[in-house]
Structure formats: C-alpha cells, structure tokens
Amino acid sequence: MSTGLTAKTGVEHFGTVGVAMVTPFTESGDIDIAAGREVAAYLVDKGLDSLVLAGTTGESPTTTAAEKLELLKAVREEVGDRAKLIAGVGTNNTRTSVELAEAAASAGADGLLVVTPYYSKPSQEGLLAHFGAIAAATEVPICLYDIPGRSGIPIESDTMRRLSELPTILAVKDAKGDLVAATSLIKETGLAWYSGDDPLNLVWLALGGSGFISVIGHAAPTALRELYTSFEEGDLVRAREINAKLSPLVAAQGRLGGVSLAKAALRLQGINVGDPRLPIMAPNEQELEALREDMKKAGVL
C-alpha cells in the first residue's frame, strides 16, 4: 500500500494546474515558434505551473518529431524553470516513442506524457511491454495517459498497479473517468492523478486528484488556478462557483473539440496561434460567435 510518497514526487515533476498547450501555426501551416513562445509565457504568467507540449491538443498526430522538439526547446528557453514542461511522446509504435522520449529528455523535458497506443489495440501485456520500454529509455518521469475513447483500449486496473511499480512512472492523466476504480488506484499506487477531462476537474480533486491537465485552461488560466487554490484552502463554495462559471467553456469544448476550442479562444483573447492542421477544422463564423458568447458567460472575454 502506498504512503502517498509517489503522488508527492509526481506533483514535484508534473505540477498542479496545467494545459495541454496548442501548437501554433502560421497562415501557411508551418509551425510558429514565436507564437509558441508567446502563448507559453502568457499561460505561465496567468498562473499555470505546467505545460504539456505535443499532446492531443498540441496536434501530435500532425506534427513531426522535429517540430515537436523545436517547440519544446523554444518554450524551455522562454519560460525557464517557471513551469514544468511535459513532452508528449506517446505513439502507437514503441520504437518511435522510445526515440521521442530520448530526444525530449535531451531537449530539457521535465516529464513525459505517454498515451496508450492507439488504433493497434494491443493486449494489456502489450501495454506493459510498451510503457516499460519507454520507461527504461530515460530517467525522465512519466505520466501515463489513459484515454480509451481515442486509443480504443483502457489501461486496466491490474496493469496500472504493475506499471506503478516502475520507478519513473509517477503520474496518470485520466480521460477515462472510471471514478470508482480510480479512487482505489489513487490510494493503492500513490500515483499523482490528473484530470484529463475538464468536466471532471473538481470531481477529481474531491477524489484525491493532484491537479488538472486542461484544455479550457487556455481560455481561463487564472480561473483554473483559483479553482485549484480554493479547493486546496478548503473554500469549497468558491471552488464550486468557479467550476460552474466555467461550464460554458466545457460545453463549447464539447461542440468544437479541444484543438479548435483552444485556438479560437486564444484568438478571441488577442493571441493568434493560427488554425489547426487538417483534418481538424477551425470554427466557422457561427461557431465562433457562439464561442464568443460562451466566453463572455464564463467571464473570460
């Protein structure tokens, strides 16, 4: 049974309130490193202490390894040690993920986000071998990303217990939402547990979660930090108020998808990070107007 030491150590490496940061592009579709620096500095200035780069919202499927590393190095230079930088290195190819992990470690990542292999649907033993190979490749702490809605398979509870025994696996980003199973796993494994689904941010804190890896945090970084702080200080009334006020952003994310929501929200706030790469579409004018109204309701515009 864990004493909670792992969770404490995990938070030291992965922070408490973060976002899966967008990858900015120019009008021609090339990566925009200057805009990447700008948005990273903005988010950290507004209270976030961790940034996931090249995750789902960072359009990892449609960015190259070179682009991922260029952005990581630039953001590291921009924010210094003011925030933890977590590099998304998960793919459905173990060899590729190992190579990305090694490169991210050399580029200065504080942690690695490793998603469940998607499309190929490996067995649980395959997951153990996959995550184990990545964990053995570097000494950089790992946050597992459990998101069966995208990957097609979950990390089952027994698999999670076995993975928690590996010394560099310290955290989980949960976008599965099995609250009953996770309540036991948080206690048993001591892994730092992060909300990977904004509708459940406050719920995860109540169950012993360590923080958030958010999408709506692009639009509301200060409010998200205040939500976390209010809960930690025992002001549950205020935490509930903030959570409720942010609900229009959660609804907008459900309509638009995370990438489109995050990029459009930043643009409406005066930070241009370009459009998503295909096949993800930018919001049309009607969708953009609805988002503008949702942001006003949430008090972020």
UniProtKB/Swiss-Prot annotation:
Pfam families: DHDPS. The record marks 56, 119 as: Part of a proton relay during catalysis. It is found in: Cytoplasm. Belongs to the DapA family. Homotetramer; dimer of dimers. PANTHER family: 4-HYDROXY-2-OXOGLUTARATE ALDOLASE, MITOCHONDRIAL, DIHYDRODIPICOLINATE SYNTHASE. This is 4-hydroxy-tetrahydrodipicolinate synthase. It comes from Corynebacterium glutamicum (strain ATCC 13032 / DSM 20300 / JCM 1318 / BCRC 11384 / CCUG 27702 / LMG 3730 / NBRC 12168 / NCIMB 10025 / NRRL B-2784 / 534).
